[in-house]
Amino acid sequence: MNMGMPMPSWYDIVGLDERSNEKCKGLAESRATVEGILQKEHDSTGLPFNRMILVGFSQGGALSLFTGLQFDQAIAGIIVLSGYLPAAKQCQPKHLNIPIWHGHGTMDPLVQFPMAQKTKETVEGLGVKSYTLESFPIPHTLSPAELQKMMQFLAKTLPPDDSCKIKLKDPKDMSIKELKAAIRKAGLGSKAVGLMEKSEFIKLVQDYRDGK
């Protein structure tokens, strides 16, 4: 791919043909990265794994499918946009009831539609019980109709649940490092100049959250 020249990617792609036998160099590392993000989100916000959905386009969709099926925790769902299942022979799903929605263009020249059909067949052959593949008359891109269908899947898979609202850590329970990170993220660096005591950092973060 890319005439043999390196380019940003989740893992190495050799060609555009059948990819189930590809080694996909870098795939395991990228999977670990995504799993780390999910775990960090859970640890920092308290958001349950069953309220998380992995979504990706093209190679990102492939990684989402490969990771979501094998993550130790059961997530709410997986959305694949113009993607496929890489390294299919290495994939060992841990949760067979995760709903998957796959949108794909019938005119896609990069990840051709037969590969999407093969992916659905392969994943179902691994025992996954809910895999929906929908086609759209588009190339390797997204369309309003596809996004609308995706939103319908999201609404069905993640209905409103106030009990699962993200819980922000109380500033009083934060370490100095966490307080400084929160201050940088909120763009409060100028207001933190000259502050020395932890109590001052706590007050700055708390006042910001309270809208003061």
Which residue stretches match the model-derived regions?
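Serine-hydrolase catalytic machinery in alpha/beta-hydrolase-like enzymes
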Residues: 1-51
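Primarily recognizes the serine-hydrolase "nucleophile elbow" in alpha/beta-hydrolase
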Residues: 49-96
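Catalytic histidine neighborhood in serine/cysteine hydrolases
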Residues: 99, 117-141, 149
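Short beta-strand/loop motif that positions the catalytic acidic residue
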Residues: 101-104, 108
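Conserved alpha/beta-hydrolase "acid-adjacent" motif
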Residues: 109-115, 143
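Post-His helix in hydrolase/transferase enzymes
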Residues: 142-156
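Basic helix-extension-helix modules of the SAP/HeH family
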Residues: 162-212
